[in-house]
Amino acid sequence: MTELVYEQPLNEKIRSYLRLEYLDKQLQSNLNHDHQHRCFYPLFSLCELSERCDYRNEVLKDIERHLLQLSKWQELDHVDHQQIDLYINALTQAREPLQKPDRFGSQLKQDRFISALRQRFGMPGACCNFDLPQLHYWLAKPWEEKQQDYRSWIAHFEPLLTPITLLLQLTRSTAHYDNAVAHAGFYQGDSAQALALVRVKVDASHGCYPTISGHKNRFAIHFVQFEQQRHSDRSIDFLLATCA
């Protein structure tokens, strides 16, 4: 069996970042494979999230905070200076497009094809060709043309998604996995340092999955048997990383 990774954000900022990262991965998958009309679901979810919340200021503050921390690490002897330089350059480049005032994806609202689809996609079974003949026409286009269209649509969100990817990479890099045991299916941890993310890696052969709850200084992990859908009373070996 394979090892599965479960992540639990411990603050709203990381929760939002993970949702955006999840949609970004779906976008990239749709860019590489022809998933027909399913490619529009993550695109429209991203449109809705961007309209609901302007992440720009939060991301800019996070970039500045990490740049300051990375600059301090550069002065240390035992660190990978080349890797730090790569992150500093990447964050600096990612910061520039965020200075523009337009909301991410706002130009897609002017796209009549995209707007017509968004109005219908929330309705059950509303992708029939008599409801959306323009979609039926677009789906019949050669894959290369659809890929080009899709690439142009998701490009509107790259100024947001690129720094999100970098910031989550930096967050995950703050901790390594350590061996842990959930006795009777339960594990509790605490930290004097404010945590942002709990990561659990567990072998699927255990037949269970973790439910994680907590806040920045304390968290709890309950393992649930999938088949019975109840709390496991067995001791579960797993790997744990607590990221600040």
Swiss-Prot record:
InterPro entries the UniProt entry points to: ZapD, ZapD_C, ZapD_sf
GO biological process assignments: division septum assembly; FtsZ-dependent cytokinesis
Localization per record: Cytoplasm
SUPFAM superfamilies assigned to the protein according to its UniProt record, in alphabetical order: YacF-like
Any one GO CC term of the record: cytoplasm
Keyword entries, A-Z: Cell cycle, Cell division, Cytoplasm, Septation
Domain of life the protein comes from: Bacteria
Principal location: cytoplasm
Key word Cell cycle present: yes
Transmembrane segments: none
Listed PANTHER family: CELL DIVISION PROTEIN ZAPD (PTHR39455:SF1)
Subunit structure: Interacts with FtsZ.
Protein's name according to its UniProt entry: Cell division protein ZapD
Classification lineage: Bacteria, Pseudomonadati, Pseudomonadota, Gammaproteobacteria, Alteromonadales
